[in-house]
């Protein structure tokens, strides 16, 4: 009976692992043209966030300062009045094109993420039996290991997620989420998240080790603490 359910469960696991990349690749190609046509024919100021307006304004000011500096170096005040507006106008058009492409990528990534999340949620809901089988496999594999290897894997996972060097990984993760969703970067939120979330996660892991794992295998907890304190 287990062998009959092994293949569907394995295929389900492969499907779950490859789903984000498959959805991202296929829907990006399919939605890109449609979103581009929709955006170019129905632009709206509601999609222009404060950070995007600030970025365009900063780019405009930077261009103006560069043109002024260039003309001051050349020491041609007569041509400054004529060339400066023309050059800035061309650069503003280029900035508008770049900003338009940024809008398209934000909408495309957001749409793809929503579709991927919906498909993934549906897969979890429809694949409850496969998830139960996969969970039993993981538990069986873990419980069949000796206590030393179990302690090693637990220590590896805890150090990976809440270790000394994990803060950089969490910061990169939240920055990737913000960039992927098109949100304005907020250093305060990044700092609060990096300082608080690993601590909360570390507390939960310690609670699991002391209260849950200690009931299942006290010797494993002793080995775990011996390795972590070494």
From Swiss-Prot:
Pfam families, from UniProt? CemA (PF03040)
A GO term from the CC aspect: chloroplast inner membrane
- Tell me the keywords, alphabetical order: Antiport, Chloroplast, Hydrogen ion transport, Ion transport, Membrane, Plastid, Plastid inner membrane, Potassium, Potassium transport, Transmembrane, Transmembrane helix, Transport
User: Which GO BP terms apply?
Assistant: potassium ion transport
Topologically, how does it sit relative to the membrane? Multi-pass membrane protein
Recorded GO molecular functions are: antiporter activity; proton transmembrane transporter activity
Q: Which residues cross the membrane?
A: 7-27, 106-126, 145-165, 181-201
Catalytic activity, per the record?
Answer: K(+)(in) + H(+)(out) = K(+)(out) + H(+)(in)
Q: Where in the cell is it found?
A: Plastid, Chloroplast inner membrane
Instruction: Identify the domain of life.
Output: Eukaryota
User: Which family is it part of?
Assistant: Belongs to the CemA family.
Give the protein's biological function: Contributes to K(+)/H(+) antiport activity by supporting proton efflux to control proton extrusion and homeostasis in chloroplasts in a light-dependent manner to modulate photosynthesis. Prevents excessive induction of non-photochemical quenching (NPQ) under continuous-light conditions. Indirectly promotes efficient inorganic carbon uptake into chloroplasts.
Record-linked PANTHER family: CHLOROPLAST ENVELOPE MEMBRANE PROTEIN, CHLOROPLAST ENVELOPE MEMBRANE PROTEIN-RELATED
- Indicate what this protein is called per its UniProt record: Potassium/proton antiporter CemA
What species was this sequence derived from?
Answer: Sorghum bicolor
């Amino acid at each position: 009976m287990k062998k009959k359910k092994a293949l569907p469960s394995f295929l389900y696991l492969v499907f779950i692992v490859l789903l984000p990349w498959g959805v991202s690749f296929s829907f990006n190609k399919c939605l890109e043209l449609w979103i581009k046509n929709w955006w170019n024919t129905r632009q709206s100021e509601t999609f222009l966030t404060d950070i995007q307006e600030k970025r365009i304004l900063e780019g405009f000011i930077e261009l103006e300062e560069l043109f002024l500096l260039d003309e001051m170096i050349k020491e041609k005040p007569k041509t400054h009045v004529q060339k400066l507006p023309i050059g800035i106008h061309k650069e503003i058009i280029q900035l508008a094109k770049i900003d338009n492409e940024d809008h398209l990528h934000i909408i495309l990534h957001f749409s793809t993420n929503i579709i991927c999340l919906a498909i993934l949620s549906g897969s979890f809901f429809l694949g409850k039996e496969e998830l139960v089988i996969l969970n039993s496999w993981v538990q069986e594999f873990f419980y069949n290991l000796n206590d030393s290897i179990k302690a090693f894997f637990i220590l590896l996972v805890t150090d990976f997620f809440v270790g000394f060097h994990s803060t950089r990984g969490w910061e990169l993760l939240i920055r990737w989420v913000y960039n992927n969703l098109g949100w304005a970067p907020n250093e305060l939120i990044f700092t609060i998240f990096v300082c608080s979330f690993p601590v909360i996660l570390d507390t939960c892991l310690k609670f699991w080790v002391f209260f849950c794992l200690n009931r299942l295998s006290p010797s494993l907890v002793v080995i775990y603490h011996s390795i972590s304190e070494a």
